[in-house]
């Protein structure tokens, strides 16, 4: 309606008066509608439908008092760990009273872990590299390699002369400084990550170089056994009672040079876990998700899938399924491997998949569509699923199928998918209660340990001010629900977790 002549002015005045009267007349209904929408959002949030008992309500009140105080202080100072790079925020996180409570909390299971990134690198340096017969050499690119051998390994074109570390340490002036240099080569940690890691390809290159560097240490048979045991110990100390580990099952070697195959490795995982449970009876155990690298040809992946099928038949209680690992942006898409990935179905063999999918910022590409293909290939869980919120139809499909995403916030930040974790896309999914679990990917590579640091980032940053004890409880229970344990094992696990949870609640509520 045009209102620019004298005759139209009374009509305009009448319209404005009507709007004003409507606004003031409905002020109460606006408040009611606002309250209704806020309540609806509260119920939709992850854990929003959980009903807390009296002790849990008290514990929640105390936890939220601490959380709100820390967040208000952060809003005043603009120093907020989840908005900072983890390498620069870690020392601040460790001062947090909320973090100390999260460390106490029984977290259930860690369902997204990689085999040689889960034990603190300090242990590799201070313990493993001090063991007898440990040698070091350098590739033409200056990358470290390690090998245990007696006598000294023969030189090769791929590496410089092998040096016994015991002898080398006797020659260096400052052993502590040398060990610190080893530690720097075993992690991504740096004081200036934004300068050192200018883009995703740079950080991924260093990331995969670390795997290459430490592989010779971890895959020495005596170390391998100790490493598996220590991984369970470190997560157990962080109140995690079950682990599912992506493992490439690379050859494990003896001092003599003898090599063991994949079956030996799976059996060793099984035996070491049984040994750990003997002294930690509440620990549920571990399972392996056999994995191969997505840079390989289709024919190689087809053989790996057949290997996974065979291992799962021989070790049904240990081998959970199969996954593809590596940098999604530069590797093959799931669609590229479609024929190989269909082998189990064609052979009438059940091989569960746990695909990394959507660990990318490139929307609308074949990389991004891995999310869709993972679901079409009947994945059990989605590793990372960083891109899921950009695909509403796929998101709805995964929700209806009750297929969770495995969220690893620190990994996503360090590998440069997101800088400020308040802006992590999973915040939208948390707000609507999408199925998810929290895990830590390769915590040792990031200078972290266990699961608590990732829980902190989720609770304080991604979940915002409204994430509370209900959120934490739901995430812990989800980790049991979405594990690959049998229903009877899940029930046992839930009973053990519930006892620990009740004790945790009592401690928080009374101290």
Swiss-Prot record:
Enzyme Commission number, as recorded: 3.5.4.4
GO cellular component, one term: extracellular space
Cofactor: Zn(2+)
Tissues showing expression: Detected in blood plasma (at protein level). Widely expressed, with most abundant expression in human adult heart, lung, lymphoblasts, and placenta as well as fetal lung, liver, and kidney. In embryo, expressed in the outflow tract and atrium of the developing heart, the VII/VIII cranial nerve ganglion, and the notochord.
Stored SUPFAM superfamilies: Metallo-dependent hydrolases
Active-site feature positions: 359, 384
A GO BP entry: inosine biosynthetic process
Gene3D superfamilies named in the record: Metal-dependent hydrolases (3.20.20.140)
pH curve summary: Optimum pH is 6.6.
Key words, A-Z: Disease variant, Disulfide bond, Glycoprotein, Heparin-binding, Hydrolase, Metal-binding, Secreted, Signal, Zinc
Key word Signal present: yes
Glycosites: 127, 174, 185, 378
Signal peptide (residue range): 1-29
Record has Acetylation as a keyword: no
Residues annotated for substrate binding in this entry: 115, 204-211, 293, 326, 442
Top enzyme class: hydrolase
Disulfide bridge positions per record: 137-159
Region (PRB domain): 127-185
Compartments (UniProt record): Secreted
Subunit field text: Homodimer. Interacts with adenosine receptors. Binds heparin.
NCBIfam families found in the cross-reference section: adm_rel
Domain notes: The PRB domain is involved in receptor binding, and may be responsible for the cytokine-like growth factor activity due to it's sharing of several structural properties with chemokines. High-affinity binding to heparin/glycosaminoclycan (GAG) is mediated by a large, highly positively charged surface at the interface of dimer's subunits involving approximately residues 30-45, 389-396, and 422-428.
Protein name: Adenosine deaminase 2
Top-level taxonomy: Eukaryota, Metazoa, Chordata, Craniata, Vertebrata
């Amino acid at each position: 309606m045009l209102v620019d002549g004298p005759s139209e002015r009374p009509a305009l005045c009448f319209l404005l008066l009507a709007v004003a009267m409507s606004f003031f007349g409905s002020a109460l209904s606006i408040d009611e509608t606002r309250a209704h929408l806020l309540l609806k959002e509260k119920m939709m949030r992850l854990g929003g439908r959980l009903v807390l008992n009296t002790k849990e309500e008290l514990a929640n009140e105390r936890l939220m008092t601490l959380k709100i105080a820390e967040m208000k202080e952060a809003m005043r100072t603009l120093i907020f760990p989840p908005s900072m790079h983890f390498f620069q925020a870690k020392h601040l996180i460790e001062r947090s009273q909320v973090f100390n409570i999260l460390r106490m909390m029984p977290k259930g299971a860690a369902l997204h872990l990689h085999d040689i990134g889960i034990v603190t690198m300090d242990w590799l340096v201070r313990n493993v590299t001090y063991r007898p017969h440990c040698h070091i050499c350098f590739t033409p690119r200056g990358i470290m390699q390690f090998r245990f051998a007696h006598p000294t390994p023969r030189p090769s074109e791929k590496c410089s002369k092998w040096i016994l570390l015991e002898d080398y340490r006797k020659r260096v002036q400052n052993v502590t400084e040398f060990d610190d240099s080893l530690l720097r080569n075993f992690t991504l940690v740096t004081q200036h990550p934004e300068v050192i890691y200018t883009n995703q390809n740079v950080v991924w290159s260093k990331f995969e170089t670390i795997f290459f560097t430490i592989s010779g240490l971890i895959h020495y048979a005596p170390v391998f056994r100790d490493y598996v045991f220590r991984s369970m110990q470190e997560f157990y100390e962080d109140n995690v009672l079950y682990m599912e580990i992506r493992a490439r099952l690379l050859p494990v070697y003896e001092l003599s040079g003898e090599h063991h195959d994949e079956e030996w490795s799976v059996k060793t995982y099984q035996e070491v876990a049984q040994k750990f449970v003997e002294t930690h009876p509440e620990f549920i155990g571990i399972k392996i998700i056999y994995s191969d690298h997505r840079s390989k040809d289709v024919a190689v992946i087809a053989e790996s899938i057949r290997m996974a099928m065979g291992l799962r038949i021989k070790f049904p209680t240990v081998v959970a399924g199969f996954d593809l690992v590596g940098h999604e942006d530069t590797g093959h898409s799931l669609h590229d491997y479609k024929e190989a990935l269909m082998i189990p179905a064609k052979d009438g063999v059940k091989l569960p998949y746990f695909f990394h999918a959507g660990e990318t910022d490139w929307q609308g590409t074949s990389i991004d569509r891995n999310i869709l293909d993972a679901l079409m290939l009947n994945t059990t869980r989605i590793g990372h699923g960083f891109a899921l919120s950009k695909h509403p139809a796929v998101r709805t499909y995964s929700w209806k199928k009750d297929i969770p995403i495995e969220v690893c916030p620190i990994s996503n930040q360090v590998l440069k998918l997101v800088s400020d974790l308040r802006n992590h896309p999973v915040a939208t999914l948390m707000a609507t209660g999408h199925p998810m679990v929290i895990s830590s990917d390769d915590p040792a590579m990031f200078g972290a340990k266990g699961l608590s640091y990732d829980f902190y980032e989720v609770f304080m940053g991604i979940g915002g001010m409204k994430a509370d004890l209900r959120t934490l409880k739901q995430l812990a229970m989800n980790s049991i629900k979405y594990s690959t344990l049998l229903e009877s094992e899940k029930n046992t696990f839930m009973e053990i977790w519930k006892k620990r949870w009740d004790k945790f609640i009592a401690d928080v509520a009374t101290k």
